[in-house]
Regions:
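Charge-dense, helix-prone N-terminal extensions
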Residues: 1-106
Length: 106
């Protein structure tokens, strides 16, 4: 998945992964899309930045991967801005979305 437009590829991938989560709901507000389960927001996309609410140890490890940083939302959140949506970036997005969704279901 090599895409010269990482923002569009990131959005497309998130929509695809979310569609496989039956209890997942998406909400669009302005330029941002949030995903929640049972009212708990666990992921969001705003422009080319995706954020995921993970367990703290996973979030800390995720911050050591390329294009990833701490989120201003707190220690459970990571922000991911891929420069290129290659296979590795897509794998991280998919895994983090799924982990965040599992966490939201308790």
């Amino acid at each position: 998945m090599r895409n010269p437009q990482p923002d569009a590829a990131l959005a497309e991938l998130l929509v695809s992964v979310a569609a496989k989560q039956p209890a997942c709901r998406s909400t669009e507000t302005g330029s941002a899309t949030t995903w929640s389960i049972g009212g708990m927001v666990f992921a969001m996309l705003d422009g080319g930045v995706a954020e995921f609410r993970l367990d703290v140890p996973i979030a800390a490890a995720a911050q050591r991967t390329p294009d990833t940083s701490a989120s201003p939302r707190g220690s459970e959140w990571v922000a991911f801005r891929p420069g290129l949506m290659d296979h590795e970036a897509a794998d991280r997005v998919t895994a983090w979305f799924q982990a965040a969704a599992r966490r939201a279901t308790g």
